[in-house]
Curated annotation (Swiss-Prot):
It catalyses: DNA(n) + a 2'-deoxyribonucleoside 5'-triphosphate = DNA(n+1) + diphosphate; Endonucleolytic cleavage to 5'-phosphomonoester. It comes from Saccharomyces cerevisiae (strain ATCC 204508 / S288c). This is Transposon Ty1-OL Gag-Pol polyprotein. The modification Phosphoserine is found at S416. Residues 153-165, 402-418, 960-969 have a biased composition (Low complexity). GO terms for biological process: DNA integration; DNA recombination; proteolysis; transposition; viral translational frameshifting.
C-alpha cells in the first residue's frame, strides 16, 4: 500500500510554488534571507493561484496533481529510486504526523523517505510533538518565530487550531537543475520560516538560534529529500551528503554563506557598471570607492584588468570629464592610476575656477541644493523646431541628440561688447568659452544636454513660436502643469511642465521679459526670435548682436557650429521653489521604459501578454514596474494595424472539446503555410509549424517545397529533437488532409515510429484551430516585423523565427506561464535580444586593404539557433551571418524605407537594457574599436540572392559603403556608438574582401582562358596539331616575342582564303589592340576532309584587303568604317580579354577522313561549324567542361550518348496513328466545367465566387444581346448542322479573380457554318517587340487597355443556334445567335474586321501594310491582340483621346495608363515587363513560370545544385529502338508535347538563348525515349532555376541619328540528323535583342560556307519586313546590317564571279544576297566567333562560353 501511494505521488512542477529570489532582488545592505514582505506576498499570491487550479485527492495524496502528468503510474510499477537513498516509503499519520497536522495545512500523508537503517531514523509515535502553525491568520512574515514563542501542542489542540485558522503552508518548488539550487534554497528557507522553524535556520555565523529537536531534524531531512532530488543537487552538496547524509544544517549554513558572498560580488559588479562622476564629489572619494570595489572583486576571483576598469570608469564620466572617454584612442595601455591623475587634475582646476567666480547671482548652497533637486536624466530624443535663416543667418536644422547626465557644466561670462562691434564671434570649440580670453559664462548651474550645444547659452530659433527652456532656475511667476499643446517641427507633442516669465537684464541696464515654457524634453534651450520681436528686440546677424529698433546694442550673438547663441548671463535668476514644478526631472534609477519601445522589442506582442509575462518572470532582467504603462491602453502601433489587419476576431473556444489529456510533447499539432511568391530561389517559400498540445511550445522549420522527402526530413528532425532534449516520445500528430500529410511515405514513417496520425474530418475546420491560429499569429508578426523594419521580403522566415522565439517566452493569460516554463526551460533574457531589423555594424577583421573600412552595415534578425551569436543580414554582401562581433548603430531609425517608425527613438533604452550583458562579458572578449587584431566569428551560413526590391539606403546615409573612411567619420551621431557593444569575435570568413563589400564598377565576366583554344562557331577545343597559315614577315618579330609568354592565346578566326595563307590583322570591336591571327579557309579544310572539289568558289577578290571589314555597299554620306562602328557600337557583345599574338608552326598535314557515324548530332553538337572538329582533342579542362548538373534524380542519365537521330523504325508502334495522336493532343486544361465549379464544388467560398462570375457573364450576354430572346426554337425543327453545342467554362486568373465564360464548341463545328477563308489576325510578336523597343528609345508612354467581351460586339452572318444556359432549364429548346460567341470559328475574324473598321473610321488610324493588327497615326501606335490593346505615344493626351473614342462604342477598361515617371509593371501578352520611361525596360516571365512549371509534374530538384547551362557538349542521343507499347508511347508523346510546348512559348517570347535546345528536342517529340525525356527534364529544370532571368534593354543614346537594325547569323555545319546543319539568327534594334530563331536547314549543305549562306538568306526577308515596320512607326533613317563569322561567305557576297557555283540552290541564294546588298543598302560585316552571340542558336556550348555570350543581354 505504501509503494502504491508513493507511485501515485506526482512530482511537483517547477515554478508551481513561490517564485525564486534572484540576486537582482537583493540590495547591497540587505540580508540575503530578508526578502521584502511585498515580494513574499506576491510570491504567496502567485502560489495560491497556482495551487487553486490544482486538484487534490485526500485519500491518495496531499500534493496537488500536476497537469503535465495526467496519467498515473500503475501500482505494479516499483517506486522510483531517488539518488543515494536506499529505499523509499510513505510516512503515514500513524507514524509521523500528529492528528490533523501536515505541512499543507490539512490531514494528509506526507511523502516521507527516511533512512530506515540509519541511527537517525526514529519512527515517531502518535504523541510526537511537531511545530504548529500560528493561531492568527496573517502573512507568513508575521508568524511568531520559534525562539520568541515556540509552543508545542498535542494532536487535539492541533486539530482545534487547524479548524479555527485553516492556515495553509505552501511547499517550496521542486529543484529541477543544479544551477537553480541557490534560488531554491531561498524558497526552502522561507518554507521553514512559515512552518515556525525559523529558529533552527543557521545565522550568518553558521549557528542556529536554538537547538533542533529530533522530530524537527527528521522533518527537515525528509522535506529536503522530497523537494531536492539528488540528481539535481550541486557537486558541493553531494560532497557534504557523501560524508554525512543527514547533515542538512551544514548545507543550509554553507548556502547562506555563499549567498552573502554572491550578494556582495553582485552589488560590486552593479556598482562598477553604473559608475557616474561629474565632479560633484571629491575626486579622492571617487577614487577610493572605485579602488575598493576593484580590489574586492580581484580578491574574490573576479579579475578586472586595467583595460576594462578604465573603460567602465570613462563610460560614467560626464560634464568636464567627458572628454576623457576618448583618451583611450591615444593611450591604449592607460592604467587606472593614470586615469585618476587626469580626473584629479580636472577636479582641482574646476575647484579653482569655482572659487574665483563671483557669487552675486546665487550662493553655493543654493547651487548644491538645486543640483540635488534637479538631477538631470536621460530622456528620449526630441527634435526641436529648426532655426531658420533670418537676415544673413546661416541656421541649419537642429539635429536630435540624447540628453547627457552632466550636472555641472563649464560656465562662462560674456565680457562687455561695444556697440560698434561688427565682426562675428566665431567659436570653433565649446571649450573656448572657459579659456578666459573672450567670453565667460554666468554661474548659473546648467545641465549640458548635447555634445554640440554651447554651454550656458540659448539657441536663437527663428522658426519657434514659443521660448522653451529646460532649467527652472530662470523662470519667474511659474505655474505648474499648464494646459498648453506644443509640437515640434515633426508634429510631435512636447510635454510642458510649467509656464512663466523669462527676464533679461541686458548690458544697457534695460530689463525685458517674455513668456517661457519649461520642459526637460528638448535638446537645446530655445529662444524664440518671434517673441523677442514682440518686445522690440531683433537679431542682427550682420553685426552679430541683439539690438532694439533704434540700434541700441543689447547683447552679442555667438556663432558656434551652424547655430547662433546668446549667453544666459543676461537672464535674471528666480527665487522659485524648485519642488513646485512637477516632473521637471526624473532620476535615472526611476525612469521607466516607454511602452512603445517594449512593444517593439517583444515582437509587437499586445500589452496584456507582455504584462502577464513580466509578472510571471518569463521575461527576465526587469520587472513590470519598470515599464511605463500609461500609454499602453490608447497606444496604436501603425505597423501592427498594417501587419495584423484582419476581417474579424477569431472565435474563442474553437478547439476540439473531446480531445484527451496528454503529457508534454506527446500530442503535436502541425500545419504548412505557403507558398510565398516572388522570392529569390535561396529563400524558403513555405514553413511548417509544430505546437505541443500541453506546453504550447512551438517550432518552425523552413521549406523550399512541399515534396514528400522534404516533409519527411522535418518530421525526422523534430521527433529526434523531442526525444533527445525532452526525453519524450510523440504519440499523436494532428494535421489536415493535405497531400503532404496523407502520402504513403509519411504514413509508413509514422506507422514505423508508433505515432498515430490524427487527420481533420470533412468540413471540420475547428479541429485544426491550434496550428492554423499559430500560423496566422506568426504571419501577422511577420508582416508587422517587415513593415516596421523595412527589410526585403525574402527575409520573411527570419521574422517568423524571431516571432517564434519571443512567443515561446510570453506567458499565456490562461496558464499564467510561458511555453518555455511549461517545458522546464529558463526564461528569455531580454538583454540578449535586439529589435528585429535593428541597424548594426559588423566588424570585418580581415579586409583586403588596411585603409578599407572595417564596419559592414547590417540588420539584426534573430538569435542564432546554433551558437551564442546573432543572425545578421548584410545587404552589401547579400548574406546573413552568425556573429557576436557587432555594434548597435545608435541614432538611426530601424526602418529602411521612407516612413518614420515613430516619434520616439529608443537608443538610450536599448543601451540601458543591454548594458549589463554587454559590459560584463569576459575581459578577453571586450575589444577596442581600433584594435587591429580583432578576430571575428562570421559564419556566413547562407547566400541570399536579393529580390529586385532592395533594402532602402538608410544605413548608407550613416555609413556609406562606398567610402574608404571608417563609419564613425560620417556623422557626429556615429561617435556615440557604444564601444562596449563590440562582441567577442572568434573566426571570420576568409571570403570577405573589399571586392565583395564595396560596390565597384561593373567587372567583365570574361573567363581567363589559360589554354590555346579554337572555338570555331563557338565550340571550344584545345588544339594539339599545328595550324595551317604561316606568319607573315611583317609580324614575325611580334609573334616570336609573344610566343615566349607562358600564358598565350590566339584568335579563333581563320581566313577563308584558299590560295593565300597570310595573316589578316583584325580590328577589334572589344576595345583591344589589333592582333595578327592566322586564317584557314573552309574550302581548304573541305578538300582535305571530303576529298572533292568545293561546291562554291571561295577565292578572294583581286584586292586582298588586310582589314577584316568587308562592306559591300558604301553610302555616300557615311564611310564604311563609321557605319561599321555605328552598327556594332551598341550591340550586347561579350568583352574579351586582350590576347597575345602567337607564332604557329608548319601547316596542317593531311587530315583524316570524317567518321561517317558522326553525322548525327546531339545537345552537345558533335559537328561544330569548325572544320577541325575531327582533329581537335575532345579532352577539355575541368573548368571548361563543368556543367554543375549534380542532381539526385535517377532518371537523368549522364553517360555519353551518341546521336540525336530518331530511329528509322519503332517496334510495336503504329507510326501513322502516333502522328495523328500528336496532332490531336490537347493542351493542359486549366479551366473547370459547370459541374466542377458549381454543382459538385465542396469549397463553399470558391463556389460562391464562381456563381457570382456565372451571373456576371449571363448578364453581360443579355446586355450584349448575344441571342434572340424573343423566340425559342424546337430542336427537331432545326438542321443539326446549324446547332452549336455550348458550355460554361470557369477559371481563376493569376490576379486571383474568378471568371466564367460562355463559349461555343467550335472544335465540333460543321464546316458549312463558317467561311474558311476568313482569318483571325493578331499582332506578331516581332511587331510588339519592335514597338516596345522604339517606345524605350523615344520616351513613349505605354498604355494597356482591355475590351470586355470583345467578340460579342461583332455580329454573326450565319444562321446558328445554341442550347440555352443551364440556369434557364430549357434543355429541349434552342436560341438563335446574333453575336460572335467565343469559340466559334468565325468569331475572331468577325471581331478583327469590326475593331479594324472602327479604328480606321472613328479613331483616324491606319493599319501598317504587311503587319496585321498594327495601327498608327501621326501620334499613336496601337498593337492589337484580340481584346488587348497596347498604345504607344509621345504625348499621353493622345492616348487618352483614343481611349475616349473607344469608350463610346466598347466597354474599355484601362489596365495601366502608364503615366508615372517611376518604374511601371505590365503584363502584356504573357510578358512581365518593367518599364521606366527614358531609362530601361526588363522583360521576363518569372511569375508565370513559377505558377506553370510545377503543374507539369516534372521531377524538379530545388535542393540540388542549380544548373548553369541548359545542356552540355558531348552528350548524344542513343540509336536504340523504342520497345514500348502503344499506350505508353502516346502517354510519353503527350508529356513531351506539354513540356516542349511550354518551353517553345517561353523561348520565342524572350528566352532566345534556349531556342537551340528547344528546337532540337522538338524534333524528337515522336521519339520519347528515356534519354530524350531526361534531356527535356534538364531543360525544364534550367528554366526553373533561371525563371527570374530577364531580357534587359537600355535606352539608346539620344544623339543617335539613325535606327540600326542588325541580324547576327551563325550556322553549325552537319550537326543534325542526316547531315543537316543547324542555323540561327538573332535580331537587334538599336542594340536591343528583339527576336531570335534556331532551326534545322531545309537543304543539306556540303560546306560550312553553304551553311552560313543558308543562315544569312533565311534572315534577310524578316530583316526587310522589320525595316519597313520601323520606318512606318518611326521616321528616322534606318541602317540595316548583317554580321557573320564566315569570311568566305562575305567574299562570295562581294564577288561578281558567277562561274564556280556548284549547284543552283545555293547559287540562287548567294545571288539573292548580292542583290539585297547592292539594292537595299544592306551592310555585311565580319564578327569574331568568340563574340558571335548567335552561336548559342546553333550548338551547345560550355558553361563559360554560354554565360559569356548571353550575360550582356539576358540576366
Amino acid at each position: 500500500m505504501e509503494s502504491q501511494q508513493l507511485s501515485n505521488y506526482p512530482q511537483i512542477s517547477h515554478g508551481s510554488a513561490c517564485a525564486s529570489v534572484t540576486s537582482k532582488e537583493v540590495h547591497t545592505n540587505q540580508d540575503p534571507l530578508d526578502v521584502s514582505a511585498s515580494k513574499t506576498e506576491e510570491c504567496e499570491k502567485a502560489s495560491t493561484k497556482a495551487n487553486s487550479q490544482q486538484t487534490t485527492t485526500p485519500a491518495s495524496s496531499a500534493v496537488p496533481e500536476n497537469p503535465h502528468h495526467a496519467s498515473p503510474q500503475p501500482a505494479s510499477v516499483p517506486p522510483p529510486q531517488n539518488g543515494p537513498y536506499p529505499q523509499q516509503c510513505m510516512m503515514t499519520q500513524n507514524q509521523a504526523n500528529p492528528s490533523g497536522w501536515s505541512f499543507y495545512g490539512h490531514p494528509s500523508m506526507i511523502p516521507y523517505t527516511p533512512y530506515q537503517m540509519s541511527p537517525m531514523y526514529f519512527p515517531p509515535g502518535p504523541q510526537s510533538q511537531f511545530p504548529q502553525y500560528p493561531s492568527s491568520v496573517g502573512t507568513p512574515l508575521s508568524t511568531p518565530s520559534p525562539e520568541s514563542g515556540n509552543t508545542f501542542t498535542d494532536s487535539s489542540s492541533a486539530d482545534s487550531d487547524m479548524t479555527s485558522t485553516k492556515k495553509y503552508v505552501r511547499p517550496p518548488p521542486m529543484l529541477t537543475s543544479p544551477n537553480d539550487f541557490p534560488n531554491w534554497v531561498k524558497t526552502y528557507i522561507k518554507f521553514l520560516q512559515n512552518s515556525n522553524l525559523g529558529g533552527i535556520i543557521p545565522t550568518v555565523n553558521g549557528k542556529p538560534v536554538r537547538q533542533i529537536t529530533d522530530d524537527e531534524l527528521t522533518f527537515l531531512y525528509n522535506t529536503f529529500q522530497i523537494f531536492a532530488p539528488s540528481q539535481f543537487l550541486p557537486t558541493w552538496v553531494k560532497d557534504i551528503l557523501s560524508v554525512d547524509y543527514t547533515d542538512i544544517m551544514k548545507i543550509l549554513s554553507k548556502s547562506i554563506e555563499k549567498m552573502q558572498s554572491d550578494t556582495q560580488e553582485a552589488n560590486d559588479i552593479v556598482t562598477l557598471a553604473n559608475l557616474q562622476y561629474n565632479g560633484s564629489t571629491p575626486a579622492d572619494a571617487f577614487e577610493t570607492k572605485v579602488t575598493n570595489i576593484i580590489n574586492r572583486l580581484n580578491n574574490n576571483g573576479i579579475h578586472i584588468n586595467n583595460k576594462v576598469a578604465c573603460q567602465l570608469i570613462m563610460r560614467g564620466l560626464s560634464g568636464e570629464y567627458k572628454f576623457l572617454r576618448y583618451t583611450r584612442h591615444r593611450h591604449l595601455n592607460m592604467t587606472v592610476a593614470e586615469l585618476f591623475l587626469d580626473i584629479h587634475a580636472i577636479y582641482e582646476e574646476q575647484q579653482g575656477s569655482r572659487n574665483s567666480k563671483p557669487n552675486y547671482r546665487r550662493n553655493l548652497s543654493d547651487e548644491k541644493n538645486d543640483s540635488r533637486s534637479y538631477t538631470n536624466t536621460t530622456k528620449p530624443k526630441v527634435i526641436a523646431r529648426n532655426p531658420q535663416k533670418t537676415n544673413n543667418s546661416k541656421s541649419k536644422t537642429a539635429r536630435a541628440h540624447n540628453v547627457s547626465t552632466s550636472n555641472n557644466s563649464p560656465s562662462t561670462d560674456n565680457d562687455s561688447i561695444s556697440k560698434s562691434t561688427t565682426e562675428p564671434i566665431q567659436l570653433n570649440n565649446k571649450h573656448d568659452l572657459h579659456l578666459g580670453q573672450e567670453l565667460t559664462e554666468s554661474t548659473v548651474n546648467h545641465t549640458n544636454h548635447s555634445d554640440d550645444e554651447l554651454p550656458g547659452h540659448l539657441l536663437l530659433d527663428s522658426g519657434a513660436s514659443r521660448t522653451l527652456i529646460r532649467s527652472a532656475h530662470h523662470i519667474h511667476s511659474a505655474s505648474s502643469n499648464p494646459d498648453i499643446n506644443v509640437v515640434d517641427a515633426q508634429k510631435r507633442n512636447i510635454p510642458i511642465n510649467a509656464i512663466g516669465d523669462l527676464q533679461f537684464h541686458f548690458q544697457d541696464n534695460t530689463k525685458t521679459s517674455i513668456k517661457v515654457l519649461h520642459t526637460p524634453n528638448i535638446a537645446y534651450d530655445l529662444l524664440s526670435l518671434n517673441e523677442l520681436a514682440a518686445v522690440d528686440i531683433t537679431a542682427c546677424f550682420t553685426k552679430n548682436v541683439l539690438e532694439r529698433s533704434d540700434g541700441t546694442v543689447l547683447a552679442p550673438i555667438v556663432k558656434y557650429g551652424d547655430f547662433y547663441w546668446v549667453s544666459k548671463k543676461y537672464l535674471l535668476p528666480s527665487n522659485i521653489s524648485v519642488p513646485t514644478i512637477n516632473n521637471v526631472h526624473t532620476s535615472e534609477s526611476t525612469r521607466k521604459y516607454p511602452y512603445p519601445f517594449i512593444h517593439r522589442m517583444l515582437a509587437h506582442a499586445n500589452a496584456q501578454t507582455i504584462r502577464y509575462s513580466l509578472k510571471n518572470n518569463t521575461i527576465t532582467y526587469f520587472n513590470e514596474s519598470d515599464v511605463d504603462w500609461s500609454s499602453a491602453i490608447d497606444y496604436q502601433c501603425p505597423d501592427c494595424l498594417i501587419g495584423k489587419s484582419t476581417k474579424h476576431r477569431h472565435i474563442k473556444g474553437s478547439r476540439l472539446k473531446y480531445q484527451n489529456s496528454y503529457e508534454p510533447f506527446q500530442y503535436l499539432h502541425t500545419d504548412i503555410f505557403g507558398p510565398v511568391h516572388n522570392l529569390p530561389k535561396s529563400a524558403p517559400s513555405y514553413f511548417i509549424s509544430f505546437t505541443d498540445e500541453t506546453t504550447k511550445f512551438r517550432w518552425v522549420y523552413p521549406l523550399h517545397d512541399r515534396r514528400e522527402d522534404s516533409i519527411l526530413d522535418v518530421f525526422t528532425t523534430i521527433l529526434a529533437f523531442i526525444k533527445n532534449q525532452f526525453q519524450a516520445s510523440v504519440l499523436v500528430i494532428q494535421m489536415d488532409r493535405g497531400s503532404e500529410y496523407t502520402n504513403r511515405t509519411l504514413h509508413k514513417f509514422l506507422e514505423k515510429n508508433g505515432i498515430t496520425p490524427c487527420y481533420t474530418t470533412t468540413a471540420d475546420s475547428r479541429a485544426h484551430g491550434v496550428a492554423e491560429r499559430l500560423n496566422r499569429t506568426l504571419l501577422d508578426d511577420c508582416r508587422t516585423q517587415l513593415q516596421c523594419s523595412g527589410l526585403p521580403n525574402h527575409l520573411w522566415f527570419s521574422a517568423i523565427e524571431f516571432s517564434t522565439i519571443v512567443r515561446n517566452s510570453l506567458a499565456s493569460p490562461k496558464s499564467k506561464k510561458s511555453a518555455r516554463q511549461h517545458a522546464g526551460l529558463a526564461g528569455l533574457d531580454i538583454s540578449t535580444l535586439l529589435p528585429f531589423g535593428q541597424p548594426v555594424i559588423v566588424n570585418d577583421h580581415n579586409p583586403n586593404s588596411k585603409i578599407h573600412p572595417r564596419g559592414i552595415p547590417g540588420y539584426a534578425l534573430h538569435p542564432s539557433r546554433n551558437s551564442y551569436g546573432y543572425i545578421i543580414y548584410l545587404p552589401s554582401l547579400k548574406k546573413t551571418v552568425d556573429t557576436t562581433n557587432y555594434v548597435i548603430l545608435q541614432g538611426k531609425e530601424s526602418r529602411l524605407d521612407q516612413f518614420n517608425y515613430d516619434a520616439l527613438t529608443f537608443d538610450e533604452d536599448l543601451n540601458r537594457l543591454t548594458a549589463s550583458y554587454q559590459s560584463f562579458i569576459a575581459s578577453n572578449e571586450i575589444q577596442q574599436s581600433d584594435d587591429l587584431n580583432i578576430e571575428s566569428d562570421h559564419d556566413f551560413q547562407s547566400d541570399i540572392e536579393l529580390h529586385p526590391e532592395q533594402p532602402r539606403n538608410v544605413l548608407s546615409k550613416a555609413v556609406s559603403p562606398t567610402d574608404s573612411t571608417p563609419p564613425s567619420t560620417h556623422t557626429e551621431d556615429s561617435k556615440r556608438v557604444s564601444k562596449t557593444n563590440i562582441r567577442a569575435p572568434r573566426e571570420v570568413d576568409p571570403n570577405i574582401s573589399e571586392s565583395n563589400i564595396l560596390p565597384s564598377k561593373k567587372r567583365s565576366s570574361t573567363p581567363q582562358i589559360s589554354n590555346i583554344e579554337s572555338t570555331g562557331s563557338g565550340g571550344m577545343h584545345k588544339l594539339n596539331v599545328p595550324l595551317l597559315a604561316p606568319m607573315s614577315q611583317s609580324n614575325t618579330h611580334e609573334s616570336s616575342h609573344a610566343s615566349k609568354s607562358k600564358d598565350f592565346r590566339h584568335s579563333d578566326s581563320y581566313s577563308e582564303n584558299e590560295t593565300n595563307h597570310t595573316n589578316v590583322p583584325i580590328s577589334s570591336t572589344g576595345g583591344t589592340n589589333n592582333k595578327t591571327v592566322p586564317q584557314i579557309s573552309d574550302q581548304e579544310t573541305e578538300k582535305r576532309i571530303i576529298h572533292r572539289s568545293p561546291s562554291i568558289d571561295a577565292s578572294p577578290p583581286e584586292n586582298n584587303s588586310s582589314h577584316n571589314i568587308v562592306p559591300i555597299k558604301t553610302p555616300t554620306t557615311v564611310s564604311e568604317q563609321n557605319t561599321e562602328e555605328s552598327i556594332i557600337a551598341d550591340l550586347p557583345l561579350p568583352d574579351l580579354p586582350p590576347e597575345s599574338p602567337t607564332e604557329f608552326p608548319d601547316p596542317f598535314k593531311e587530315l583524316p577522313p570524317i567518321n561517317s557515324h558522326q553525322t548525327n548530332s546531339s545537345l552537345g553538337g558533335i559537328g561544330d561549324s569548325n572544320a577541325y572538329t575531327t582533329i581537335n582533342s575532345k579532352k577539355r579542362s575541368l573548368e571548361d567542361n563543368e556543367t554543375e548538373i549534380k542532381v539526385s534524380r535517377d532518371t537523368w542519365n549522364t553517360k555519353n550518348m551518341r546521336s540525336l537521330e530518331p530511329p528509322r523504325s519503332k517496334k510495336r508502334i503504329h507510326l501513322i496513328a502516333a502522328v495523328k495522336a500528336v496532332k490531336s493532343i490537347k493542351p493542359i486544361r486549366t479551366t473547370l466545367r459547370y459541374d466542377e465549379a458549381i454543382t459538385y464544388n465542396k469549397d463553399i467560398k470558391e463556389k460562391e465566387k464562381y456563381i457570382e462570375a456565372y451571373h456576371k457573364e449571363v448578364n453581360q450576354l443579355l446586355k450584349m444581346k448575344t441571342w434572340d430572346t424573343d423566340e425559342y426554337y424546337d430542336r427537331k425543327e432545326i438542321d443539326p448542322k446549324r446547332v452549336i453545342n455550348s458550355m460554361f467554362i470557369f477559371n481563376k486568373k493569376r490576379d486571383g479573380t474568378h471568371k466564367a465564360r460562355f463559349v461555343a464548341r467550335g472544335d465540333i463545328q460543321h464546316p458549312d457554318t463558317y467561311d474558311s477563308g476568313m482569318q483571325s489576325n493578331t499582332v506578331h510578336h516581332y511587331a510588339l517587340m519592335t514597338s516596345l523597343s522604339l517606345a524605350l528609345d523615344n520616351n513613349y508612354y505605354i498604355t494597356q487597355l482591355d475590351i470586355s467581351s470583345a467578340y460579342l460586339y461583332a455580329d454573326i452572318k450565319e444562321e446558328l443556334y445554341i442550347r440555352p444556359p443551364p440556369h434557364l432549364g430549357m434543355n429541349d429548346k434552342l436560341i438563335r445567335l446574333k453575336k460572335s460567341l467565343y469559340g466559334l470559328k468565325q468569331s475572331g475574324a468577325n471581331w478583327y474586321e469590326t475593331i479594324k473598321s472602327y479604328l480606321i473610321k472613328q479613331c483616324g488610324m491606319e493599319e501598317v501594310r504587311g503587319w496585321s493588327c498594327v495601327f498608327k497615326n501621326s501620334q499613336v501606335t496601337i498593337c492589337l491582340f484580340v481584346d488587348d490593346m497596347i498604345l504607344f505615344s509621345k504625348d499621353l493626351n493622345a492616348n487618352k483621346k483614343i481611349i475616349t473614342t473607344l469608350k463610346k462604342q466598347y466597354d474599355t477598361k484601362i489596365i495601366n495608363l502608364g503615366e508615372s515617371d517611376n518604374e511601371i509593371q505590365y503584363d502584356i501578352l504573357g510578358l512581365e515587363i518593367k518599364y521606366q520611361r527614358g531609362k530601361y525596360m526588363k522583360l521576363g516571365m518569372e511569375n508565370s513560370l513559377t505558377e506553370k512549371i510545377p503543374k507539369l509534374n516534372v521531377p524538379l530538384n530545388p535542393k540540388g545544385r542549380k544548373l548553369s547551362a541548359p545542356g552540355q557538349p558531348g552528350l548524344y542521343i542513343d540509336q536504340d529502338e523504342l520497345e514500348i507499347d502503344e499506350d505508353e508511347y502516346k502517354e510519353k508523346v503527350h508529356e513531351m508535347q506539354k513540356l516542349i510546348g511550354l518551353a517553345s512559348y517561353v523561348g520565342y517570347k524572350f528566352r532566345f538563348d534556349l531556342l537551340y535546345y528547344i528546337n532540337t528536342l522538338a524534333q524528337h517529340i515522336l521519339f520519347p525515349s528515356r534519354q530524350v525525356l531526361d534531356m527535356t527534364y534538364e531543360l525544364i529544370q534550367f528554366m526553373w532555376d533561371t525563371r527570374d532571368k530577364q531580357l534587359i534593354w537600355h535606352k539608346n543614346k539620344p544623339t543617335e541619328p539613325d535606327n540600326k537594325l542588325v541580324a547576327i547569323s551563325d550556322a553549325s555545319y552537319g550537326n543534325q540528323p542526316y547531315y543537316k546543319s543547324q542555323i540561327g539568327n538573332i535580331y537587334l534594334l538599336n542594340g536591343k535583342v528583339i527576336g531570335g530563331k534556331s532551326t534545322k536547314a531545309s537543304l543539306t549543305c556540303t560546306s560550312t560556307t553553304e551553311a552560313e549562306i543558308h543562315a544569312i538568306s533565311e534572315s534577310v526577308p524578316l530583316l526587310n519586313n522589320l525595316s519597313y515596320l520601323i520606318q512606318e512607326l518611326n521616321k528616322k533613317p534606318i541602317i540595316k546590317g548583317l554580321l557573320t563569322d564566315s569570311r568566305s561567305t562575305i567574299s562570295i557576297i562581294k564577288s561578281t564571279n558567277e562561274e564556280k557555283f556548284r549547284n543552283r540552290f545555293f547559287g540562287t541564294k548567294a545571288m539573292r544576297l548580292r542583290d539585297e546588298v547592292s539594292g537595299n543598302n544592306l551592310y555585311v560585316y565580319y564578327i569574331e566567333t568568340k563574340k558571335n552571340i548567335a552561336d548559342v542558336m546553333t550548338k551547345p556550348l560550355p558553361i563559360k562560353t554560354f554565360k559569356l555570350l548571353t550575360n550582356k543581354w539576358i540576366h
